[in-house]
Amino acid sequence: MDSGKVVITLKEKEEKVKDLRPIDDVFFEVLANDVNFCQEMLQILLEDKDLVVTDVVVQSSEKNLYGRSVRLDALCVLGNGKKCNVEVQRSDNDDHLRRVRFNAASIAVKDSQEGEKFEQIEDIIVVYISQFDIFKADRVLYHVDSTIRETGDRVDDGLYRVFVNTEVKDGTTVSEYMECFLKKEVNNLKFPAFTKRMNALKHEERGLDAVCEVMEKYEQKAVEEGLSLFEKAITMLASGKSPSEVVLTGVPQNIVDRASRAMKPKLNK
């Protein structure tokens, strides 16, 4: 029986995903759904060759209990019981420090038990990967700690924040690893798990299917969000708001323009 779903060939799948890079949300979500990849990544970025990853929960995973309102690109469970949330950000259009604080707090609240003492709250590591130098100090890697202003002493509150970027090139292993996030193909003997995972997702049918499935989810979500914004624009325009006022509420200009054109026949009647 024909399900109505279009079947595409291996070649067509390769063509569909060929331009995706690790820094792209849709691709990283699939890329990170692999313990070996995440373990190698964190060993390098956290500079700990003995680090062990025992489990990974990605945004689309059935194991994800945190909800869509909390964007967790890859939540890794480490061998020592700590959790490490890896986030990828291409656009410099938000308050990144507050985003990190919000997501870390959400993880802590979700995983805490009623009546649990605060000393029992699990430590959380956040690795924030960006396509830009967030602190503009020409470093590829930043560690952000809580400190006492008067003494300069570091305070251990259980939150460890590491910011790493693809913009700065300083010749280190971390910098070389981050350069791979901008490539469409990765073939580097220094990063075997990264190389193997990229090859599987770009050239093996099972991996290609996984990428295409997530791409379809992103495309469907974009359609739904666009429709919701279009309906919002129509409602606001019908209530007497000007197009510029609608744009100020966060509706993109192109959607407001479409809504305005759709309203014209009604206004002319």
Predicted segment positions?
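Short, charged alpha-helical interaction segments and adjacent helix-coil junctions
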Residues: D2-P22, V26, V77, C84-Q89, ...
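Accessory alpha/beta interaction modules
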Residues: M1-Y160, D170-T172
